[in-house]
Amino acid sequence: MYPAHLLLLLAVCVSLLGASAIPPLPLNLAQFALVIKCADKGKRPRWHYMDYGCYCGPGGSGTPIDELDRCCKTHDECYAQAEKKGCYPKLTMYSYYCGGDGPYCNSKTECQRFVCDCDVRAADCFARYPYNNKNYNINTSKRCK
């Protein structure tokens, strides 16, 4: 085997090993991003919601810092209710329709409907309230008490 071929094979193996160390984004969260886009007509990038306030993004604690953050807290609570029903909200895929008035759920199973309703309500809530750049990537240990 030629040295160039070995180098190429090594590069492929290293990149595959690196990719396997990155956890995949749960499918529902990717779908939730599309529901948000439908509700707010694409006004804001989805990543704006990944680290906003005390509740938008992983985890959450303290008092929500504004109405948009309160939407995320309510969404977290809705997912907790879904889990109590035996659903897996971060993995549950559902069927929805993006109409002129925003997203609508049309899923068949109880878990799909419940999780879809959680996401649609949160997305509609996000679309109603302003985004405050000062509340993005905040120091949660100081501001979320």
UniProtKB/Swiss-Prot annotation:
Keywords: Calcium, Disulfide bond, Hydrolase, Lipid degradation, Lipid metabolism, Metal-binding, Secreted, Signal. Ca(2+) binds at Y55, G57, G59, D76. It is found in: Secreted. Its cofactor is Ca(2+). It catalyses: a 1,2-diacyl-sn-glycero-3-phosphocholine + H2O = a 1-acyl-sn-glycero-3-phosphocholine + a fatty acid + H(+). One of its GO terms (biological process) is arachidonate secretion. Its EC number is 3.1.1.4. Its main location: secreted. SMART domains: PA2c (SM00085). The keyword Acetylation does not apply. Disulfide bonds join C38-C98, C54-C144, C56-C72, C71-C125, C78-C118, C87-C111, C105-C116. Binds 1 Ca(2+) ion. GO terms for molecular function: calcium ion binding; calcium-dependent phospholipase A2 activity; phospholipid binding. Residues 22-27 form a propeptide. It comes from the Eukaryota. Residues 1-21 form the signal peptide. The active site is at H75, D119. The keyword Coiled coil does not apply. One of its GO terms (cellular component) is extracellular region. InterPro entries: PLipase_A2, PLipase_A2_Asp_AS, PLipase_A2_dom, PLipase_A2_dom_sf, PLipase_A2_His_AS. PLA2 catalyzes the calcium-dependent hydrolysis of the 2-acyl groups in 3-sn-phosphoglycerides. Belongs to the phospholipase A2 family. Group I subfamily. D49 sub-subfamily. This is Basic phospholipase A2 PC14. It comes from Laticauda laticaudata (Blue-ringed sea krait).
